[in-house]
Amino acid sequence: TEKNLGQRAILSNIRKYCSLTQVFQVFLIWRRKQLSDMKAAIKTADLPSKPVLLRAIIAMSYAHWEGYVRTCANRYFEHLALRKKPFVEFERQIYVNSILGRLDALYRGRVSLEERCKIINDILDGGDGRFSYLNPDLVDTRSNLNTDVIKDICMICDVDSNHFEQNRTFLDILLLKRRNAIAHGQQEYIQTDEIDDLVAKILSLMGFFRNLLENKVYTKAYAANNSLVRTLVGAAQAPCDPIAHD
């Protein structure tokens, strides 16, 4: 019956959503555990070892921040690409993404005249093809995932970046500037009593980015002509596997 078909469609959508949620969760669990183990090691370390471990947890926190954002973004696009739907069934940004990498190659003069003509024709055709692949260079953390870079990644994913802008001081100064100083062998003094808040904050930002993508999938805000949902997606609540923070 029509009712049963509708119920099956809803269940199918939940299964697809939860499968992506489970992937996100798996990649988060081991990162959270490593940070938790490092915090425990710092608290029980002897005085000479503590400064080394404090510097290490800054580098580790940044590494997990960068790695998790990149993983979530790539898995999100893989999730959409597996549908092999026409570009016209997705929000405009999906089609824009398909052109961006090719435009970069065009700008750098690495393509033939034939390929340049093809790029222009593809743009003029308005997305007649299917979305089945994302240029991996687009989700580029630049080994320097500061506020401006995460905003670019949010643009590629077509999600709101305001929350990260509001945390610019934490990302760019308390995390990234310190990480860069440590990576270049400079002295950087970290206080033991700030580690709990720092780790909780980075896990919160990782979880926030994950939720932005999960909510888009659950509400199908990635679909064409779904602008109302996209305006509400930031307030949507994920129905599966809520993130627990340390």
Set out the residue ranges of the language-model regions.
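Polyanionic, low-complexity intrinsically disordered segments
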Residues: G6-A40, D148-D246
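Helix-centric, low-specificity signal for extended rod-like, repetitive segments
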Residues: F24-Q25, P48, A63, G109, ...
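A long, hydrophobic alpha-helical segment
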Residues: S36-R55
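Alpha-helical scaffold segments that form or flank carboxylate-/histidine-based iron centers
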Residues: K50-A63, F90
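Helix-loop junctions and short alpha-helical segments
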Residues: M60-S61, Y68, C72-F164
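A broad, structural surface signal
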Residues: Y62-R70, N74, A200, S204-G207, ...
